[in-house]
Swiss-Prot record:
The keyword Hydrolase applies. The active site is at 245 (nucleophile or transition state stabilizer). It comes from Schizosaccharomyces pombe (strain 972 / ATCC 24843). Disruption phenotype: Lacks queuosine in tRNA(Asp). Supplying exogenous queuosine (Q) or queuine (q) results in q incorporation in tRNA(Asp) in the wild-type S.pombe strain, whereas the deletion mutant strain fails to utilize exogenous Q to modify its tRNA while retaining the ability to use q. This is Queuosine 5'-phosphate N-glycosylase/hydrolase. GO terms for cellular component: cytosol. GO terms for biological process: nucleoside salvage; tRNA-guanine transglycosylation. Its EC number is 3.2.2.-. Belongs to the QNG1 protein family. Keywords: Hydrolase. One of its GO terms (molecular function) is queuosine nucleosidase activity. It is an enzyme of class 3 (hydrolase).
Length: 346
């Protein structure tokens, strides 16, 4: 059991305001298993998404790395519904289409590359002369009134991460991967040691608890893009857990895998800005990881791991969000929005 999973179990056993519903997890496992059977081997393939790279080479590795160091906090301050055709939330227009959330990040990077800006090159974005702050800001120019959240933090992280790759790993994520010898947990240790902004760790009831959303999703997206081969081969890939963000916990609650206290529900329904490392936030993230582990145990298939389930749930959440769909498991409940925490970790 990985450190993240051990800490998630500890949180779930001691949680006050978030609980894992084992019956709900078992029911959802049955439902997901049926979905996977009907979708077949093509389900949730990383390369099927229109904005993901279609080639499997070193340039794609650096694309993945840049996306994952910036993959955090895309929920909107101006649009509570967080979706809709007339949303004012941060958006990137690319090839005649508006993209929001994680997809706005992918669109911005692809748009810059199309314009001849080598934005995925660590040597480029580490260099303030070649790549000034104003250029990075222009890459993330919004098509709406809302600007990209935490722009200054994103620029800082790009500079710091790029310098580490240039100074220690031959200027590429590829150099970092070669040091991990096909071991996901070794890659994570290197990320935590050399890249401080991957250190997604909270203290809960006196215990240091690892969440590691972005470090783990970097492993997962590398694995998914390269389909477990070459740069994407990790012999311990099943040690990776669900990625504790703000979107998947929301759908886990909708599906009846999680239950929230009345106090936590009230805070979410008020769209309260909750501080990072608030106990309720830690409980939500830890219990989400443990809930997906329970789902995984109930599915009990060698070809399904926590990454598979997380990708499936995230895609489903975005689909339901776009359609305004509400599952029958919470039919008597108002829709609870995603947690509003401004953090560089998710």
């Amino acid at each position: 059991m990985s450190r993240v999973l051990q800490d998630a179990e500890f949180i779930s056993l001691n949680s006050n305001d978030v609980k894992v519903n084992k019956g709900g997890c078992a029911a959802v496992a049955t439902w997901i298993k049926e979905k996977l059977d009907s979708l077949g081997p093509q389900f949730a393939e990383w390369q099927n998404h229109e904005l993901h790279p279609k080639t499997r080479d070193v340039s794609t590795l650096d694309w993945i790395f840049l996306v994952d160091i910036l993959n955090f906090s895309f929920w909107s301050d101006v649009d509570v519904e967080d979706s809709g055709k007339h949303s004012k939330r941060f958006s990137i227009e690319y090839k005649g289409k508006l993209y929001t959330g994680y997809w706005s990040l992918c669109a911005a990077i692809n748009k810059a590359l199309d314009a001849g800006i080598p934005i995925t090159s660590p040597a480029f974005y580490a260099d303030e002369k070649q790549c000034p702050d104003t250029l990075i800001a222009s890459v993330f120019d919004s098509a709406t009134v809302e600007k990209i959240p935490l722009l200054e933090e994103r620029i800082r992280i790009m500079r710091a991460s790029g310098r580490v790759l240039v100074d220690s790993y031959h200027g590429s994520y590829c150099g970092l991967l070669k040091k991990c010898h096909n071991q996901a947990q070794r890659l994570i240790k290197l990320l935590l040691a050399d890249f401080p902004d991957f250190r997604d760790v909270s203290v809960y009831k006196g215990r240091e608890c690892y969440m590691l959303k972005r470090a783990q999703i970097l492993v997962a997206e590398t694995w998914a893009c390269f389909q477990g081969q070459n740069y994407g081969r990790f012999d311990d890939i099943d040690s990776i857990t669900m990625f504790a963000d703000y979107r998947v916990p929301q759908i886990l609650w909708q599906l009846g895998c999680l239950s929230y206290s009345s106090d936590f529900k009230k805070r979410l329904l008020k769209n309260e800005l909750i501080a990072h490392n608030d106990p309720m936030e830690i409980e939500m993230r830890g219990c989400s990881i443990w809930a997906v582990e329970k789902i995984l145990q109930n599915i009990n298939r060698k070809d399904v791991n926590a990454i598979t389930i997380d990708f499936f749930l995230w895609d489903l959440a975005k689909e339901w969000q776009a359609k305004g769909y509400k599952p029958s498991t919470q039919v008597d409940e108002v829709t609870i929005p995603c947690i509003r925490v401004r953090s560089i970790y998710y």
